[in-house]
UniProtKB/Swiss-Prot annotation:
Residues annotated for ATP binding in this entry: 247
Alphabetic keyword roster: Aminoacyl-tRNA synthetase, ATP-binding, Cytoplasm, Ligase, Nucleotide-binding, Protein biosynthesis, RNA-binding
Motif 'KMSKS' region: where in chain: 244-248
Example of a GO MF term: ATP binding
Reaction catalysed by this enzyme: tRNA(Tyr) + L-tyrosine + ATP = L-tyrosyl-tRNA(Tyr) + AMP + diphosphate + H(+)
Organism: Prochlorococcus marinus (strain MIT 9312)
Subunit record text: Homodimer.
Pfam families: tRNA-synt_1b
Localization per Swiss-Prot or TrEMBL: Cytoplasm
GO CC terms of this entry: cytosol
Motif 'HIGH' region, chain ranges: 50-59
Protein name: Tyrosine--tRNA ligase
Amino acid sequence: MSDKLILPSWLSRGIEEYFPIKGIDQTFSEIIDDAKKNNKKLRVKLGIDPTGTDIHLGHSILFKKLRAFQDNGHIAVLIIGDFTAQIGDPTGKNKTRVQLSEKQVKDNAKTYLTQLGMGKPANESILDFDSKDKIEIRYNSEWLKGLNLNSIIELMGSATVSQMLAKEEFNKRYNSQVPIALHEFLYPLLQGYDSVVVQSDIELGGTDQKFNIAIGRDLQRHFKQEPQFGVLLPILTGLDGIKKMSKSEFNTVGLTEDSLSMYSKLEKVPDNIIPTYFELLTELDLSVLNDANPRELQRRMALEVTTLFHGAEEASKAQSNCEKLFLGHKEKVGEIPEISLKDIVFPVKFFYLLSSLKLFKSSSESKRSIKGGGVKIDSQKVINPDIVFDSKKDLEGKILQIGKKIIKRFEN
């Protein structure tokens, strides 16, 4: 029997993988069962690098699982990577990240904690901040900023270059002769050292974090600690049903979005990702997927997720208002004037695209409007004028809104 099959449902739901199956003395399920029987609080680590200002539904999966551990008697150890964020996790990147300033990182961290519900009652927040015995919030600058050269050399001596090059992103860049900065090799070691300092029993992460979590296990072993278990959750597919949820793909739902915006986006997701959204974003029994038609499932899922983040009353209002808008304006999408992309040379920066389409008098005016939050794509503000669109497919069919008056639909 797979060890996963005997895990409690609150833990097994949505998990892509955990490792190892068996620790030094016990399997993962035995660790969980033993903790319950003996009222032992496991230390469950989740690290977040505040490299941006907004949390979206893709991020929320990990926080929901961390909350499940809290609700079942364990300690959430939330690591704010204020030091590591200034380096930048190379995971998923084909080039060196731009380093952030200390002030940028601190400001971002404040917005993250606010979005997670800090200051709100436990029944209105994503994490339980009320019960001090259920959460520890640590900033890794506490221990990383003061590391001396001897300590850094000891960390670096616990891993090998060949081990680092086994990481997919490093391997690709090395083989393609794309530069890898030495400080990027240090990132997984610093994340792993966080686990040593907080003595985590379990670390949560997306499937793309397996390498970094495994490094944490190695470092705990190096420092004579019992290695943590890794629990990996899927990377959520975005609203387009194809690419991972990411602001750069304009396929996200942000936690700060109002209830109408959240509901209206979710009720239009493609059929192929509805089951995944039900499993990862709601608490409903998955048997609801068996009989209902896709349209009913879209509405049910959108209502449940909006309820989770805005409450039942706001979610119900959003559903009602969305239906009124649909009934009153269902023909109007086809009436939105098109704007052709046929003469645009891709790849192209966003500000240059808009000025090339004669939507602004100059590139500088285009930049100012974008930075000021006056431009949206599919109801989502785009505030980075330098974002690059690789091809027409990135924009075809999407709705561009500039201020309150200009609305266009991108077409080839």
